[in-house]
Amino acid sequence: MWSDPIADMLTRIRNANQVFKEQVDVPASNLKKAIADILVREGFIKGYTYIEDGKQGILRIQMKYKGTRKNRERVIHGIVRVSKPGRRIYVGKNNIPRVKNGLGIAIISTSKGVLTDKEAAEHGVGGEVIAYIW
């Protein structure tokens, strides 16, 4: 049986976003924290808190929406897992993908940590493309 914790996290965020949930709980890991940091920095989620549960911990992610409670609009329009356990996708520094012509971001795991596509281009590094978000 295969398991993909990153795909699970992205799916939980996507599902919570579809039904306008205020928050969603995800089992924690260092990679998931790095991804959540990028989502906060880029304005896709309000924030997250780490909750110690005696095991691996939980990330409680606060979702972000535009507009009033009655006329809400989603901030995250799409979220896609790119590199999967069965098929890893790597890019060099010259082939970093643009998401929705620059309106979205690509999350890339590099030797300098987990970065957005713009940050990876600035640092001049490539790596494994984790996800696209727009």
From Swiss-Prot:
Chain segments annotated as coiled-coil in the UniProt record: none
Alphabetized GO MF terms: rRNA binding; structural constituent of ribosome
GO cellular component: ribonucleoprotein complex; ribosome
GO BP annotation list: translation
Keyword RNA-binding: yes
SUPFAM superfamilies with a match to the protein in the record: Ribosomal protein S8 (SSF56047)
InterPro entries assigned to the protein according to its UniProt record, in alphabetical order: Ribosomal_uS8, Ribosomal_uS8_CS, Ribosomal_uS8_sf
Gene3D superfamilies found in the cross-reference section: 3.30.1370.30, 3.30.1490.10
General function of this protein: One of the primary rRNA binding proteins, it binds directly to 16S rRNA central domain where it helps coordinate assembly of the platform of the 30S subunit.
Matching NCBIfam families: PRK00136.1
Record note on quaternary structure: Part of the 30S ribosomal subunit. Contacts proteins S5 and S12.
Protein name in the entry: Small ribosomal subunit protein uS8
